[in-house]
Amino acid sequence: IVSEMNLHFKMAVIQSEFDHDYVKEKLRAGDISPLGPVPELTEGDVDEAVHIVAQMGEEPFIKALEGGAQVILAGRSYDPAEFACLALKNGFDRALATHMGKILECAAITALPGSGSDCMMGTLYEDHFVLSL
């Protein structure tokens, strides 16, 4: 698409997949623990996994923006991260930016009447945000 439309921009690519050996190294070091009442992860589990993908927050997006990225192509992330990252980079309140991002990621489905096919716009201020369809 970029070539066909003759577009030019600085793009960042953020991977979210982990190498199996890295995960096993962290497991042996005791750096991995269960989240909730689930069995401990084993090296066998790691070996059997086809892909190991982590969910990232806004930090990698902010780093990409600080590096001059105009477009970011990323793996799995916490849904509000893409919406909150620019606001956080620019010093806005984390709670407000994340709250607005969480609503925006669901878009107009959060409105009455709800619609998964419509867009929503958010404007963030120092102490509040405004959403509009």
Locations of regions flagged by a protein language model:
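An acidic, phosphate/nucleotide-engaging active-site surface
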Residues: 18-74
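Catalytic cores of large soluble enzymes that bind and process phosphate-bearing ligands
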Residues: 1, 49-56, 92-95
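Glycine-rich anion-binding loop/nest that anchors nucleotide
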Residues: 72-77, 115-119
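Gly/Ser/Thr-rich loops at beta-strand to alpha-helix junctions
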Residues: 1, 76-82
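Catalytic or ion-translocation cores adjacent to nucleophile or general acid/base/metal-coordination motifs
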Residues: 3-19, 83-132
